[in-house]
Amino acid sequence: MKLRLLRCLRQQPAKPAAVMTHKEDQYPVSLDHHVLKDMAKGVRDTTVKILLLGTAESGKTTIIKQMRILHINGFTDDERREKIPEIYQNIHESILQLVGQMGVLGIDFGSCTSERSADYILSLPGSAPEYMNEEYCDHVTTLWNDVGIRACYDRSNEFPLLDSAKYFLDNFVRISDAEYIPSTEDILHSRKITTGISQITFRVPIPKSMGGGEQQFQMYDVGGQRDQRNKWIQVFEGIQAVLFLISCSEFDQNLREDPSQNRLQEALKLFRAVWQNRFLASAGLIVFLNKYDIMERKIRAGKHIVDYFPEYEDFCKRPQQDNCFGESDWTKMFIKQKLVDITQEPFKRHSRNQVDLGTSERECYYHFTVATDTRCIRDVFCDVQKMILSENVSSMGLF
């Protein structure tokens, strides 16, 4: 199964999620229906194990949530209510961080009222209030509407801030309502640090053209912080595919745990370690270049990857068949090429966890994704699933 998935990754061309199609006639249907059904049963009887890897805040847990939405009927009202403290904490941490950075960045508040609201927020503990009382809500609303706080937010790449800060603060009036129940979108944007290992099991329908029935998947999520990565090896055994998430938007940010380290550089370094790890050498590797929507917003706001990766300038000078690309397109291609270069470089085995000397024949399958976009993730995962099933049939020499 592992090698079959690997071959299928090499055979299928990488396409952006936005242009994917998933018509059943993409796959051959000339075999006898009963033969297809028997072969599909062989696939169904094997649980496909997928491991999510990547740095912290790259979107791994959001993918787990999407699998639940798409394949396990989403969240009950009780489960939604259980997310309220997490969302409150996201809001509290965001406004607290913004207020705390005003002095550091030398930004003034727009009014004396905002200054008083800032003093109130700074007097509170780091944990969010259990209930959104009127006084707290008034101060948060005042601060988020302050021109100084907005200027601070525009420089949020200079300090740690949740990607979802703007989303939650923009929706604060709705969220602070006493009858609030989190929406699916709220849950997808919520953030809680992953520690340890979590797992989700779900079943996905198999197309009728491939025998019908269902395929079972197990997906594992592990913490992406540096101090959590030593736990990863615990789930390497039996993994048939690795989904490696890398955040395209983090080219101008530094790590929370190491402010001297660029986040994208850290992600590339981690990808190299995963690529060279001998325990994952037979697993298919799929890369989700995630959060490209945030990356595009940053570029429109005047941020440029060349300020953090000087080699980008030479990359853009390379001859291309189509020179009509905008800066966002070039940036996406540049980040992807960084990953491709890693997969093509020869390397020596420096530790027992690395594969042997030589140039690996493995190839990756790349997708640009927005993990909070259910439609995008549905299309991407549908395509990956069909590849797995199609290759299992074709590997038997019948196509």
UniProtKB/Swiss-Prot annotation:
GO molecular function per UniProt: G protein-coupled receptor binding; G-protein beta/gamma-subunit complex binding; GTP binding; GTPase activity; metal ion binding
SUPFAM superfamilies, per database record: P-loop containing nucleoside triphosphate hydrolases, Transducin (alpha subunit), insertion domain
Domain (G-alpha): residue spans on this chain: 46-399
Region G4 motif, annotated ranges: 286-293
InterPro entries per UniProt: Gprotein_alpha_su (IPR001019), GproteinA_insert (IPR011025), P-loop_NTPase (IPR027417)
Region (G3 motif) location: 217-226
Keyword terms of this UniProt record: GTP-binding, Magnesium, Metal-binding, Nucleotide-binding, Transducer
Chain sites annotated for binding GTP: 54-61, 188-194, 221-225, 290-293, 371
Hydrolase recorded as keyword: no
PROSITE patterns attached to this UniProt entry: G_ALPHA
CDD domains membership: G-alpha (cd00066)
GO cellular component: cytoplasm; heterotrimeric G-protein complex
Region (G1 motif): 49-62
Tissue expression profile of the protein: During embryogenesis, expressed primarily in the developing gut and transiently in the amnioserosa.
Region of interest: G2 motif: 186-194
Keyword GTP-binding: yes
Gene3D superfamilies per UniProt: GI Alpha 1, domain 2-like, P-loop containing nucleotide triphosphate hydrolases
Pfam family, one: G-alpha
Sequence positions that bind Mg(2+): T194
GO biological process: adenylate cyclase-activating dopamine receptor signaling pathway; mesoderm development; positive regulation of hemocyte proliferation; regulation of filopodium assembly; sensory perception of chemical stimulus
Region (G5 motif): 369-374
UniProt family annotation: Belongs to the G-alpha family.
Record's function text: Guanine nucleotide-binding proteins (G proteins) are involved as modulators or transducers in various transmembrane signaling systems.
Subunit structure, as described in the record: G proteins are composed of 3 units; alpha, beta and gamma. The alpha chain contains the guanine nucleotide binding site.
PANTHER family per UniProt: GTP-BINDING PROTEIN ALPHA SUBUNIT, GUANINE NUCLEOTIDE-BINDING PROTEIN G(F) SUBUNIT ALPHA
Protein name: Guanine nucleotide-binding protein G(f) subunit alpha
Native organism: Drosophila melanogaster (Fruit fly)
Gene: Galphaf
